[in-house]
Curated annotation (Swiss-Prot):
Signal peptide: none annotated. It comes from Manduca sexta. Inhibits trypsin. Residues 22-56 form the BPTI/Kunitz inhibitor domain. Disulfide bonds join 31-55. This is Hemolymph trypsin inhibitor A.
Amino acid sequence: AGLYKPPNNIESENEVYTGNICFLPLEVGVCRALFFRYGYDPAIKACXEFMYGGCQ
């Protein structure tokens, strides 16, 4: 929980996304932190780990 920016259909950042995290887009962020996250990678058509840099 709390790993991703909420999808557009969630009205508040305080709401929790309860769906499959692998269907969320890979959002790497613009900062330089290095957090491991998971999301759907259309290039490989599967859920994959990626590095999230923080900040939106």
